[in-house]
Regions:
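Cytochrome P450
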Residues: 1-433
Length: 433
């Protein structure tokens, strides 16, 4: 998961940053729709860019971002405390539950707290357990495709890309499918706080209420698991024990919120962005359709897996990951001072020509497994095996059912976020196979 708080910190500037000719306006609709030409320029002219608007450093080169991911001692993942400290006291009072539970998310932790939480949750959330979910993921995908019925025009996000990951995580946690609308609403409202690049007291109140509601929702289900264990991930989390170390009630609630939120928001964008890319490269769409519909099942699965990696590289769901400078040091001649914030633009790294030949071309035969969409190092996304699996199941299933998929209407509107890269809606026209 790549969820962080992305609005500018109050105050703070760096004296050593020379004025750049580049004016990075992340909220500009044109930049939200297509940031890649500007990222190309930043990568060439100012790869360690100081943004006065964000009061932060912005990195765009693959090697620099990978290096930062491997230096947890110099680059801290604990970006909540400086963010909360920057909020005026009156605003901070409005987000007590957000602070309570987000501060327990492992994505905002450094060692040793991160190590402990990762060790515990890794016992139940790993590649083998994710692969065991394949039949359920396929059942959910087929159910959603069946629900589309005979429609030839529909919003791909609301009909498929949105509900799929939410239903998958709900099935894993063992919460009722009938709660989908409530769960999605709570997740979307929390996203207003975590992913938005604009400050708004209204969004604080909305996200705080949603966090409180989701916490009570999971508290109820956790209590049920203690008295009547089930065969689901939530029961496994409740029963975790590593030499006497267990998750506290607040840690259990925070972890469930994290899994649901991350699994929903990020994977929705993964599936939607991937489908948009396939509509823009129709030859690649047809290639994926043909090469995942043969009688050779192992070959189908192998190509589907490779195709998903390329879709994640080309236009993945992650805008940025964030670090806080823990030790003053230099990067490409720029002095990064302790306490300053650093945005690692993952989607820019994935288009770096030093890492990929013809990076702005979608090539499903490319070996794209080295992409940084899920991060790298200690903080690589815990749920990346599940996100990959959902793509490996979803795209072949959709392309088997539909002989063609194309976008309709005006260009999609992209969400105003530095953290997430996704659209509000994706109207499509399909022709049934």
């Amino acid at each position: 998961m790549s969820a962080i708080l992305s609005e500018p910190l109050h105050g703070g500037a760096t004296a050593n940053a020379a004025q750049s000719a580049i004016d990075y306006r992340p909220e500009d609709p044109a930049i939200l729709a297509n940031p890649f030409p500007l990222f190309d320029r930043m990568r060439m002219e100012d790869p360690v860019h100081w943004s006065p608007r964000l009061k932060s450093w912005v990195l765009t080169r693959y090697d620099d971002i990978k290096r930062v991911c491997l230096e947890p001692a110099r680059m801290s993942s604990d970006r909540l405390r400086p963010f909360f400290a920057s909020i005026p006291s009156e605003e901070a009072k409005k987000i007590g539950d957000i602070m309570r539970y987000l501060s327990l998310w492992m994505v905002f932790k450094d060692a040793p707290e991160h190590t402990r939480l990762r060790r515990l949750t890794g016992k139940v959330f790993h590649n083998k357990s994710m692969q065991a979910m394949r039949p359920q993921v396929d059942d959910i995908a087929q159910w959603l495709i069946g629900r589309i019925g005979d429609k030839t025009e529909f919003d791909f996000i609301s009909e498929f890309a949105g509900p799929l990951p939410c239903l998958v995580i709900m099935a894993m946690l063992g919460v009722p499918r009938e709660d989908l609308a409530q769960v999605k609403r709570m997740s979307d409202q929390i996203a207003l706080f975590i992913g938005s690049s604009r400050t708004s007291s209204e969004k604080y109140g909305t996200a705080e209420a949603a966090t409180h509601e989701m916490a009570e929702y999971f508290r109820h289900h956790i209590t049920l698991r203690r008295t009547a264990p089930r065969d689901d991930l939530m029961t496994e989390l409740v029963q975790l024990n590593d030499n006497g170390d267990t998750l506290s009630d607040d840690e259990l609630i925070a972890t469930c919120i994290l899994l649901l939120f991350a699994g929903h928001e990020t994977t929705t964008n993964h599936i939607a962005n991937g489908m948009l890319s396939l509509t823009r490269f129709p030859n690649e769409q047809q290639k994926l359709r043909v090469r995942t519909s043969t009688a050779n099942q192992p070959a189908n699965a192998k190509f589907a897996a490779a195709a998903v990696e390329e879709l994640l590289r080309y236009d993945g769901p992650s805008g940025a990951q964030v670090r806080i400078v823990a030790q003053t040091h230099e990067l490409r001649g720029k002095q990064l001072k302790e306490g300053e914030r650093v945005f690692m633009m993952l989607n820019a790294a994935n288009r770096d020509p030093e890492a990929y030949a013809q990076p702005n071309v979608l090539d499903l035969d490319r070996d794209g497994t080295a992409h940084l969409t899920f991060g790298f190092g200690l903080h690589i996304c815990l749920g990346f095996p599940l996100a990959r699996l959902e793509g490996q199941v979803a795209f072949p299933a959709l392309l088997k059912r539909f002989a063609s998929v194309e976008t309709i209407g005006p260009e999609p509107k992209w969400i105003n976020s530095l953290v997430f890269r996704g659209m509000n809606a994706l109207p499509v026209r399909v022709r049934r196979a």
